[in-house]
From Swiss-Prot:
It holds the Pfam family Tropomyosin. It comes from the Eukaryota. Residues 113-143 are annotated as: Disordered. Keywords: Coiled coil, Repeat. SUPFAM superfamilies: Tropomyosin. Tropomyosin, in association with the troponin complex, plays a central role in the calcium dependent regulation of muscle contraction. Residues 113-142 have a biased composition (Basic and acidic residues). This is Tropomyosin. PROSITE patterns: TROPOMYOSIN. InterPro entries: Tropomyosin (IPR000533). The lineage of its organism: Eukaryota, Metazoa, Ecdysozoa, Nematoda, Chromadorea.
Amino acid sequence: MDAIKKKMQAMKIEKDTALDRADAAKEKVRQMTDKLERIEEELRDTQKKMMQTENDLNKAQEDLAVANTNLEDKEKKVQKAEAEVPPLNRRMTLLEEELERAEERLKIATDKLEKATHTADESDRVRKVMENRSFQDEERANTVESQLKEAQLLAEEADRKYDEVARKLAMVEADLERAEERAEAGENKIVELEEELRVVGNNLKFLEVSEEKALQREDSYEEQIRTVSARLKEAETRAEFAERSVQKLQKEVDRLEDELVHEKGRYKNISEELDQTFQELFGY
């Protein structure tokens, strides 16, 4: 009887131990499953970060390409503006030369007008003298009258030429004024272009700094990609190790479950034997 009780106690202890081992195995499987899920979540986050890093790098490259295109356009505008300056300078030189020639022609016409005016005054004086002498010499009077008419014609011609010269001078002055306006506009354009060139230079310096920063960011991205790749490889290794561990644990759980079934069978057999023994004892 004591042997049977000891055997029953031993079987109960063995059964409890098996159940505890099975529970421990299940808990370990659950922990490994949770750990594997965390590893998979970390792997997904790493992949998202890698995609974001690639997108940032592509955007930086696109921004750099746009900046280079804008810089080329600015350089073309500056070159075009610089090409417009020499023709304006040549035009100003031609207008100045034309103005000098017009002033010279005006001086000549003015001298002729002064001479004609002097001749007319002299003729008028002579005419008055002749009138005071009561036209004593008709022939001389006619001569003087002819000279007077000629002088008047010369004066009219001088007036006409003076008007023509004045008109041409006004035209030249208007052309000169327009040329000065164009020259002033050209100078303003040059100032604007110089300012734009300065801005372009500053933008170029900024782009060079931005390009250097972009290269640094690219190096940083490459370093991050290498780090992420290493972490990914490490995560894959850990995942493979975890998978192998899970497989081993699963095998251990299966073994423990089989052992538990076996122990339950043994416990059932022992219980049946005990029942039969009790029946025999009580029957005895």
